[in-house]
Amino acid sequence: MQHLQPNTTLQGGKYKIERVLGQGGFGNTYVGYNTEFEETVAIKEFFMKGVTERNETTSVVSVSNADNVQQFEEQREKFKKEARRLRKLKNEHIVKVHDLFEENGTAYYVMDFIDGESLAEKMKKTGQPFTEAEVRSILSQILEALKEVHQTEIWHLDLKPGNIMIDKRGNAYLIDFGASKQIRANGSMTTSTALCYTPGYAPNEQIGQMYDRFGPWTDIYALGATVYNLLTNKKPPMAIDIEEDEEDAFDFPTTVSNDMRKLVVWMMQP
C-alpha cells in the first residue's frame, strides 16, 4: 500500500484524509480535512517510491532495504526544508503552509487546498494552447510570486506548466518547491548533490550543473519556456538550440503578437 486510506486520521484526529490528490516519486498529496477549523486542506506526505513501504494495519512507513536508510533520512530532511521555505513566503500566488509534523515514521506538511488543476493538466484536457490574454494574466501572477521567492534568495529551479496551478477564478499559484535551493549567507547554495531538471525548461547553467551561475535568471528562463508551451502547446526548444536574439528555434502561432514573441525570446536567452 503506497498511500493512506480515506478516513485515516493524523495528529490525534486534527486532520482526516479524504482522498489521494497526486502521487510522485518522493511523496503523496492528499485532500484532507482540518477538523479543528472545519476546512479542506492539502496534505503532503513524504514517501519514496521503491524505497519505502507501508504497514497496511498501522500505516507506518519503513525503509524496505537497510542500505537505503541514510538516503531516506536525508531526503526526508529535504522534504521538511521545502516546507519551511514555503512557510517563509508570503504571497497570494504561493500556496501557504500551515503545519509540519512527523508521524507514521515519515513527515507531512499541510497547505491550503487549491480547487483547480495544473496548467499542464488543463492543456492536456483541452488539447489546445492558452490564449495570449490568458497567458499574460498567468505570467503577471507568477512574476509576482517569483519576486517574493527571489527576494528571499530562493531559486525555484523546476518552473513548468505542471508546477503552476490555476483555480476556477483564473488565479495562478506557483507550487512544488521540492527542487528549490536557498542561498546561504556566504553566497553558496544549499546543495551538494546533482540537481534534476526538466528538458526544455532548463537553461545551460542548470543542464551543466554550473551552480555558481544560478540566479533569478535561471527561473526566468524556465518561465519563458513555460509561456512558450502555453502559447503553442509544443515542447520548448533545448537551450543549446537557441541562438541569441533569434526566433529560429521557436514556432509561434500567427495569433501570437510580436511583443509576446520578443518577450519569450528575451526570457529564454542562453
Q: Where does each model-flagged region fall?
A:
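Activation segment signature within eukaryotic-like protein kinase domains
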Residues: 138-139
